[in-house]
Amino acid sequence: MTQSPFTLEANGLVLAVRLTPRASRTGLDGVRTEASGRPVLSLRVAAPPVEGAANAALTAFVAKSLGLRKAEVTLLSGETSRTKRLLLSGDPQTLAARVEAWLGG
């Protein structure tokens, strides 16, 4: 059974992301497993990792893809790292269903 790149919290859902900045296009690459064995959502953005541009592009892309407001997607950790944790605010079960649908499963 494949592990999920997200965990349910009382106030929403925490999504583990591996971000590739300065990509040719912004998009979702699917779920991958890091060397530590932790599953992460692999995403790419066209924005460079300069002055928070890639992080802003990431939160905007995730919000748009899941039908959320930008304010409902918060960067919890990984501001200067490729591995990040995002908090998606809202009903955890609804958010989990949206993420699963986005991942195609």
Curated annotation (Swiss-Prot):
Annotated Gene Ontology cellular components are: cytoplasm
Q: Which SMART domains match?
A: DUF167 (SM01152)
Task: Return the InterPro entries for the record.
Answer: DUF167 (IPR003746), YggU-like_sf (IPR036591)
Sequence similarity: Belongs to the UPF0235 family.
Q: What is the recorded name of this protein?
A: UPF0235 protein Mext_2130
According to the entry, what is the taxonomic lineage of the organism? Bacteria, Pseudomonadati, Pseudomonadota, Alphaproteobacteria, Hyphomicrobiales
